[in-house]
Amino acid sequence: AKPAAENLSLVVHGPGDLRLENYPIPEPGPNEVLLKMHSVGICGSDVHYWQGRIGDFVVKKPMVLGHEASGTVVKVGSLVRHLQPGDRVAIQPGAPRQTDEFCKIGRYNLSPTIFFCATPPDDGNLCRFYKHNANFCYKLPDNVTFEEGALIEPLSVGIHACRRAGVTLGNKVLVCGAGPIGLVNLLAAKAMGAAQVVVTDLSASRLSKAKEVGADFILEISNESPEEIAKKVEGLLGSKPEVTIECTGVETSIQAGIYATHSGGTLVLVGLGSEMTSVPLVHAATREVDIKGVFRYCNTWPMAISMLASKSVNVKPLVTHRFPLEKALEAFETSKKGLGLKVMIKCDPSDQNP
């Protein structure tokens, strides 16, 4: 292996304690590949772990951050056949450690022992060199950039949520929240056939971005009641949406989602807030509004790559800021302040292109 000085990594040590450190370059196992990292997006979860925890997931020992990533294969394990050095790949951060009951039914995201980048105690890939399960690295076509490859991870959240919601041709869809996850749900819904999408948020600037990437209607929330929000959504669409995708985790927004959804429709909870939430459950039950949860995603990378390669979805406008790995701390400050939408960290000093 090369000298350790060459694997600069962004490591969280505890609440508020983020450091750039040199780690050794790892050696790939038989079913792994060593990757030279290229582009890694900062996710809200990375910022939360910088503050120490997300719910039951607590940072107890130093952990490398980053899980929205792409890079180039530099070395392959002895049993790897489908990849070779030089291949550009997108990384699916969740790789099951065993073929358990959830893997057998194709819902490996629910496996309790899954490895997941930058979820304690597993290290992520905000570094120069990183090894990963080769079966969860997907080759990128020449017309898909590294940054698009990194954005497959957030896009997958949208694909999985829309799939759980049953979004189909001609649907009217409400997306609550215009942050990165709200916008990938907007993109996925449109790509999957939604005819009209309304996006709600408190922030006018985020809503203008939603409009830019394809929202049919935007609704700026100030202090309306959940029922009033539902009425406004219905007014914009002409009827209630068959599908609501809730990306904020805010109690009043979940309440509005229940009131807004068409009878017999589906509400999917993507953004998560406090564990106990007060909602008009009877209102949902008596109108047969199905409430579904999502946990990350599964089986989305191949279709996301096809969507990007065929230009049926455009994620490029989501990236608003870029920083080299050496300036990762500054990048995290930018992300934390909510100044940009998606902040991208460039890990390859010899190639800082998108």
UniProtKB/Swiss-Prot annotation:
Tissues/organs with expression: Expressed in liver.
Molecular function GO labels: D-xylulose reductase activity; L-iditol 2-dehydrogenase (NAD+) activity; NAD binding; zinc ion binding
Binding-site list for NAD(+): 181, 201, 206, 270-272, 294-296
Amino-acid positions noted as binding substrate in the UniProt annotation, renumbered to this chain: 49, 153, 296-297
SMART domains for the chain: PKS_ER
Subunit structure: Homotetramer.
UniProt name for this protein: Sorbitol dehydrogenase
Source organism of this protein record: Ovis aries (Sheep)
Gene it is expressed from: SORD
